[in-house]
Amino acid sequence: MARSDMIEVDGVIVEPRSNGFFTVRLDLENQPEVIAHLGGKLRRHYIRVVPGDRVTVELSPYDLTRGRIVYRYRH
């Protein structure tokens, strides 16, 4: 799937999960929570993500419950 097909949504890290996954609350009207993992560049550059951080998550149009964290906003 092309990167342009992905849906980008902002959210907040709620809690870390096992194996590098995180629960993220999205900034949408009904505030659904998704399970997301760190994208390649965040992992490669050892970017730390802690609960309360604002992030951008990429979601596939085929599965809106799982995603990839592609950006962490600075405080």
From Swiss-Prot:
<comment type="subunit">
    <text>Component of the 30S ribosomal translation pre-initiation complex which assembles on the 30S ribosome in the order IF-2 and IF-3, IF-1 and N-formylmethionyl-tRNA(fMet); mRNA recruitment can occur at any time during PIC assembly.</text>
</comment>
<keyword id="KW-0396">Initiation factor</keyword>
<dbReference type="GO" id="GO:0043022">
    <property type="term" value="F:ribosome binding"/>
</dbReference>
<keyword id="KW-0648">Protein biosynthesis</keyword>
<dbReference type="Pfam" id="PF01176">
    <property type="entry name" value="eIF-1a"/>
</dbReference>
<comment type="similarity">
    <text>Belongs to the IF-1 family.</text>
</comment>
<dbReference type="InterPro" id="IPR006196">
    <property type="entry name" value="RNA-binding_domain_S1_IF1"/>
</dbReference>
<keyword id="KW-0963">Cytoplasm</keyword>
<dbReference type="GO" id="GO:0005829">
    <property type="term" value="C:cytosol"/>
</dbReference>
<feature type="domain" description="S1-like">
    <location>
        <begin position="1"/>
        <end position="74"/>
    </location>
</feature>
<dbReference type="InterPro" id="IPR004368">
    <property type="entry name" value="TIF_IF1"/>
</dbReference>
<dbReference type="InterPro" id="IPR012340">
    <property type="entry name" value="NA-bd_OB-fold"/>
</dbReference>
<dbReference type="GO" id="GO:0003743">
    <property type="term" value="F:translation initiation factor activity"/>
</dbReference>
<keyword id="KW-0699">rRNA-binding</keyword>
<comment type="function">
    <text>One of the essential components for the initiation of protein synthesis. Stabilizes the binding of IF-2 and IF-3 on the 30S subunit to which N-formylmethionyl-tRNA(fMet) subsequently binds. Helps modulate mRNA selection, yielding the 30S pre-initiation complex (PIC). Upon addition of the 50S ribosomal subunit IF-1, IF-2 and IF-3 are released leaving the mature 70S translation initiation complex.</text>
</comment>
<protein>
    <recommendedName>
        <fullName>Translation initiation factor IF-1 1</fullName>
    </recommendedName>
</protein>
<dbReference type="GO" id="GO:0019843">
    <property type="term" value="F:rRNA binding"/>
</dbReference>
<keyword id="KW-0694">RNA-binding</keyword>
